[in-house]
Amino acid sequence: MWDYVKLVALGVVAAIAAYAASQARDLPYMVNMVEVALAAVIALIWVLRTMGDPKPSKDEYFDGVIRAGVIATTFWGIVGFLVAVVIAFQLAFPALNLEFGNGMLNFGRLRPLHTSAVIFAFGGNALIASAFYVVQRTSAARLFGGTALGWFVFWGWQLIIVTAATSYLLGGSQGKEYAELNWHLDILVAVVWVAYLIAFLGTIFKRKEPHIYVANWFYLSFIVTIAMLHIVNNLAVPVSIFGTKSVQLMAGVQDAMTQWWYGHNAVGFFLTAGFLGMMYYFVPKQAERPVYSYKLSIVHFWALIFLYIWAGPHHLHYTALPDWASTLGMVMSVILWMPSWGGMINGLMTLSGAWDKLRTDPVIRMMVVSIGFYGMSTFEGPMMSIKAVNSLSHYTDWTIGHVHSGALGWNGMITFGMLYFLTPRLWGRSGLYSLKLVSWHFWLATIGIVLYASAMWVTGIMEGLMWREVDAQGFLVNAFADTVAAKFPMYVVRGVGGVLYLLGGLIMAYNLWATVAKQPKTANLAVAVPAE
């Protein structure tokens, strides 16, 4: 019966999407609707082909979707890093801004593609896959909703990634940082995200373990908060239901405040709380040590959840935002430093008694460096939120360096460690294909991050000082073009750092493939047992 319901639903979706494509008022909308229709048809065929298949045992963990998530995370990571290298060199060498396809490959189109690829494709797939793995293992229960809900979340997320990418390349964007998707794709994100919440929360509800492990607290907080942020920030009235354009519900300073309430907390919950859930599970597992202080992890959780949501106004210092709101954001940001470092200390001290593994285990080394970058970024962020510091750093490349030291160092490195941990276990292999390749990846990525971040710190501070330099009469000394020319050497260094990081990602992709293809198999027990 359920299969027939799915067939009817997919048929209706395909028909509506095909009709919408035929009535489209602009190219991005038409292409997106064609993609949705094709996805629905492919899903319909897949349901037809699998209708008679035996149902999987309810005593086994649902690891198929997690394996797919590992593959997707690796693939989209490479795509995101590759686009990053292209746009880094486009900034250094503007001639690389090609006008092919009506500007499809210039910086303005590729930049949102890059941010979405690394945050929502690479990071999003990593979070979905790891959350599904962790919640099943710590609950000793199969994923709620079975294969249907799990695969809907996974393939729905891939559809969002593909439609977003094509929309950006074709010029479809609403121009909001980290929220460039137009209204019709915003709805798709909300639907898939609610399904993700149901799968995760349902698994916790049917858990066999009485205790809810702290990693699940962080995962759940990130899922719930991102849903709220996404829906409120993207409230809009479409100009036409057959076009991408819409009118935002809020305007002016209210829209700016809502946008950076969303933008900062996309960092705070998507890129921090979610990945802290990853840290609290995979670091103890890889180190084979319990969390240093479980009480500290609880304090860390509640302090972070309360404070982070207030910090958004620090993005709007010296703007039309009321001074009280700006000051409130600054104060909350400075206070946020303390729980953030509590989490960093908890992660690092989990290795107590196992520090020798840093010499022998490059995966642990990667995780430890990621925690170090988390600590550095969560000190630098509150410092940059102070108005006096922000007057120098705002609108400069210092902010870019700060974001990327966190994204590449914290999010990237902990994700790499998670992928190296999961791959042999999910495919039932005796171990990774090559620890030497992991070590190569570690050093290439670390050197790449240092080159990138330090180049942006240097050029950002230089840029801020050049902007504010005045002569004896009070006139500006430097034209804007002078500041751009002065940044050229550091832009090249940034590009080189990006190339090294990309090479590390390619080495990882080969190592993971070789682990599955060339390593001997072992018994792979995916049976629901007391918390692992």
From Swiss-Prot:
GO molecular function, one term: cytochrome-c oxidase activity
Protein topology in the membrane: Multi-pass membrane protein
Annotated residues for binding of heme b 2; high-spin: 402
Main location: membrane
EC nos: 7.1.1.9
Catalytic activity: 4 Fe(II)-[cytochrome c] + O2 + 8 H(+)(in) = 4 Fe(III)-[cytochrome c] + 2 H2O + 4 H(+)(out)
Cofactor field: Cu(2+); heme b
Binding positions for Cu cation per the UniProt entry: 264, 314-315
The keyword Kinase appears for this protein: no
Compartment(s) where it occurs, according to its Swiss-Prot or TrEMBL record: Cell membrane
Keywords assigned: Cell membrane, Copper, Electron transport, Heme, Hydrogen ion transport, Ion transport, Iron, Membrane, Metal-binding, Respiratory chain, Translocase, Transmembrane, Transmembrane helix, Transport
This protein's pathway: Energy metabolism; oxidative phosphorylation
Binding note for cofactor: Binds 1 copper ion per subunit, denoted as copper B. Binds 2 heme b groups per subunit, denoted as high- and low-spin.
GO biological process, one term: oxidative phosphorylation
Function according to Swiss-Prot or TrEMBL: Cytochrome c oxidase is the component of the respiratory chain that catalyzes the reduction of oxygen to water. Subunits 1-3 form the functional core of the enzyme complex. Co I is the catalytic subunit of the enzyme. Electrons originating in cytochrome c are transferred via the copper A center of subunit 2 and heme a of subunit 1 to the bimetallic center formed by heme a3 and copper B. This cytochrome c oxidase shows proton pump activity across the membrane in addition to the electron transfer.
PANTHER family: CYTOCHROME C OXIDASE SUBUNIT 1 (PTHR10422), CYTOCHROME C OXIDASE SUBUNIT 1 HOMOLOG, BACTEROID (PTHR10422:SF29)
Full protein name: Cytochrome c oxidase subunit 1
Name of encoding gene: ctaD
